Each structure stands twice: as structure tokens, then as C-alpha cells.
A protein has these predicted regions:
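C-terminal catalytic/motor cores of large multi-domain enzyme assemblies
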Residues: 1-286
Length: 286
């Protein structure tokens, strides 16, 4: 409330136009832009084979998530979100994705959210992703999100509606408990969908109005003709301008196609300047 949230820092040092934009486009899905990138598979395949000879196993999902984490760390404005007309800088980097317990029509899904610092190497990202998949792929496995969802479904429909409206109201006003924010996969820096793993095409996935998701990445099966993997990206335009997005996403593509750069940690994290110097737009010009 009053600009305070346990999961974010209010960004004050923004220009007037950017401050007004969230009040013009109040809904996240009304402010979403979409773009398409084709990533060359050849350098990824060469890298994966070379690492396999050294005893390290990687896949495209590992590289994509590691690239997103590194890209957000290098371009911290990507890690902002809009809530109740205000722009916040997120505390921590979070990636959410779905784990399918079995590849059949009746198998259930688990929603997983992982936290990163931005310093991680590709190996550290891989280990964290693989552990989450192993822990949640078991049929009997239930993470905290699964347990909370199951508990809510035991309530009558009218009660569930009231509870969800209350949670959304609390979220808008910064009153939602931090334990729920940590549990919610919808309060995340980016959602990732690996449709390539089920031989599906990439899609433009909408941004969720509930929560704070600002980016959605979906990668699909590579083309047999061009040997390129499609990656569709949907983004909230309210907290970043086009110039910043283009630079950041081009860097992400470069990292994806040069994954060896992700083997070394990022020692220094760039600051979100408008958070570090919140009153720079109000400083007196000499």
C-alpha cells in the first residue's frame, strides 16, 4: 500500500509519459506486444555435443532459461512490473514453467517457479531446472502451489470467487502476504513454455492479468528446412520502451546462439538506474 510491496521497489525516477502509460493501459493484456525470433540451431547442437563429450548434458530449455536469466540481469528494466498504475522493480529474478507429469491426456501439470540472482552459470541454471523437474514430475509429487490450488478447490464456487477477488484486491494494494507471492508462479519475471519438447509449434502466449508476469517466452520445434528454432516473445510494453526491448532481446538471441558465454558467471550486475537515482528527472539543470 502507498507504493510498498514485499516483492518490488517502486520506481520513482521515470519520465512523465511513462508514468502516465499504466493509467492509459490499465490491463496487462491490453499492453502486450509480440515479437518473433529465429535462433540458429547449429551452434546450439555443436555446443551440446562438445559438452556431452566432457560429461555435461544440456538441452535447449537449459540454454533458453539461462539466456533469459542473464538477459534480465544485464538489462534490469526487463524485471519490472506494473501493479495498480505503478511501476515496480522486482526483487529477484524468477522464472516459471509447467512440468507435465506424464505425456498423456490424463496426466496432471505442476507449475514451478525458480528464483535466480543473475550471477548463475549455465551449469547452475541447468541443475536448478533439472532438480525442479525431477521433484515435480513424479505422479505423487505436490509442490506448495499444487497444495494451495487443491485446498482452494475444496471450497464452494461462490466462496472461491470471493477468495480470489480478495486476493486480487490485496495484490493490487500491496497487502498480499509474501509467503503467497513466493508460492505464486504468476508473480514472476518471465514464464517459459517448451513446446519443442512435445514437437509443437511456438505460440504467442498471452500475459496473465493476475500476478506480475511481464514476459512470456515460447519455443517451438525447429524447422527441418532452415534448422532454426522459433521463439515467440510476448511482453508488457508499459515498463520498457521499444529501444530498450530491442537491445535486450537482441542480446538474449546472441547469448542463445553463443551458449559458451553462459558458462562463466556474471560478476557484476548492472543497476536499474531509475531505482538507484529516483529523483534524477527532478534534479535542477544548471
Amino acid at each position: 500500500m502507498f507504493g510498498y510491496r514485499p516483492d518490488g521497489i517502486l520506481v520513482r525516477g521515470i519520465d512523465p509519459i511513462q508514468k502516465i502509460i499504466p493509467h492509459i493501459m490499465t490491463l496487462r493484456y491490453d499492453a502486450q506486444n509480440m515479437t518473433h525470433y529465429d535462433c540458429e540451431c547449429a551452434p546450439l547442437d555443436v555446443f551440446i555435443r562438445e559438452q556431452e563429450q566432457k560429461g555435461e548434458r544440456f538441452n535447449y530449455m537449459h540454454i533458453l532459461i539461462a539466456g533469459i536469466v542473464r538477459g534480465i540481469a544485464l538489462y534490469p528494466r526487463l524485471n519490472r512490473f506494473v501493479m495498480n498504475g505503478r511501476i515496480f522493480a522486482r526483487k529477484g529474478i524468477f522464472i516459471s514453467f509447467v512440468v507435465k507429469k506424464r505425456l498423456n491426456f490424463t496426466a496432471s501439470d505442476s507449475l514451478v517457479k525458480l528464483e535466480f540472482t543473475g550471477h548463475e552459470t549455465l551449469l547452475e541454471v541447468r541443475d536448478k531446472v533439472d532438480r525442479a523437474i525431477i521433484d515435480n514430475a513424479r505422479t505423487e509429487a505436490n509442490n506448495n502451489t499444487d497444495k494451495a490450488a487443491r485446498l482452494l478447490t475444496f471450497t464452494p464456487n461462490i466462496v472461491l470467487k470471493i477468495l480470489m477477488r480478495l486476493i486480487k484486491w490485496m495484490d493490487r494494494h500491496g497487502l498480499i502476504p509474501n509467503v503467497l507471492l513466493k508460492m505464486s508462479p504468476f508473480h514472476t519475471s518471465a514464464f517459459v513454455s517448451n513446446l519443442k519438447s512435445i514437437k509443437g509449434p511456438s505460440i504467442y502466449h498471452h500475459l496473465y492479468e493476475f500476478g506480475t508476469t511481464g514476459l512470456f517466452f515460447a519455443m517451438g520445434k525447429e524447422s527441418a528446412d532452415t534448422h532454426r528454432m522459433p521463439v515467440e516473445i510476448v511482453m508488457d510494453e508499459r515498463f520498457c520502451d521499444g529501444f530498450y526491448y530491442v537491445r535486450a532481446l537482441n542480446e538474449l538471441k546472441r547469448l542463445m546462439e553463443n551458449p559458451q558465454q553462459l558458462l562463466t558467471p556474471l560478476e557484476t550486475l548492472p543497476e536499474d538506474v531509475e531505482v538507484a537515482d529516483p529523483y534524477r528527472f527532478f534534479a535542477c539543470k544548471k
